[in-house]
Amino acid sequence: MQIIADLHTHTSVTDHAFSTLTEMVQAAEDRGLAAIAITNHGPTNPDGPHEWHFSNLDLIPRKIGKVTVIRGIEFDITAPAGGINVISNKSLKPVEFALASFHECMFPPVDSSVHTAALEAILYNPYVNAFGHLGNSNFPFDHEYIISRCNDHGKIVEINNASLSIRKDSHDNCMDIARLCMKYEVPISVDSDSHICYRVGHVEGALEMLEEIGFPEELIINSSVERLNNYFKGRGLHLFDEEDLL
């Protein structure tokens, strides 16, 4: 089991990240990745870039060196009703992949029912592609209720490698969420959530957990170039050249 793309990374325009776009892409190439998504925090996050960062994402070349670059965002799920960062449709136009995640600075934890309702609202949000780091134990929610509805709304679930080391008690949550994704055949991505170039593509802990439960590789959208290409083709995006698919 492997990944060929890292779909959750942050560059230094996010203040608590440390590497430039060039450094992140070079790290992806050094790791042998075919693609990387740059997914900085939304503009209303106290540590996020200005909205113009996102409106200018289309300045980033599709391919830098050997690596395909996906233009993304990590939305903050906002309290209390499960909104996302306020950003204009014009600024969102270049965005090709969007995660939505709980962060304590934008959504102080409450209880499972409130968190579940917020996630349910995100299911209906057309701008969001994926749920980010759902295993955070500060945000308990009804796992089965949300996961069982993801396919109906075209949402994938991220298994976040960083959660396994920095978010207390997230391992069991991540495993339960992964088992439910397997049960309901919900596609997932496996990502580093890297905030520095040295961690790009490092998802060993997440892959080990998935192998432990026998998670099917065909449900991991970033486990092959073909699967990733098919995922984005389904959303009208031509991601890879023919030579990349050989």
Annotate each predicted stretch with a short phrase.
Residues 42, 47-159, 211-220, 227-246:
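Extended substrate/RNA-proximal surfaces in nucleic-acid metabolism proteins
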Residues 41, 186-200:
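Short acidic/histidine-rich active-site segments
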Residues 3-5, 37, 71, 130, ...:
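Residue-level marker for buried hydrophobic side chains located in beta-strands
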Residues 11-12, 35-41:
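Ser/Thr-glycine-rich phosphate-binding loops at phosphate-binding pockets of nucleotides
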Residues 15-18, 48, 140-148, 167-180, ...:
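Histidine/acidic-residue-rich catalytic or RNA/ligand-binding cores of hydrolases
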Residues 22-36, 58-62:
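Alpha-helical scaffold segments that flank or form the walls of functional sites
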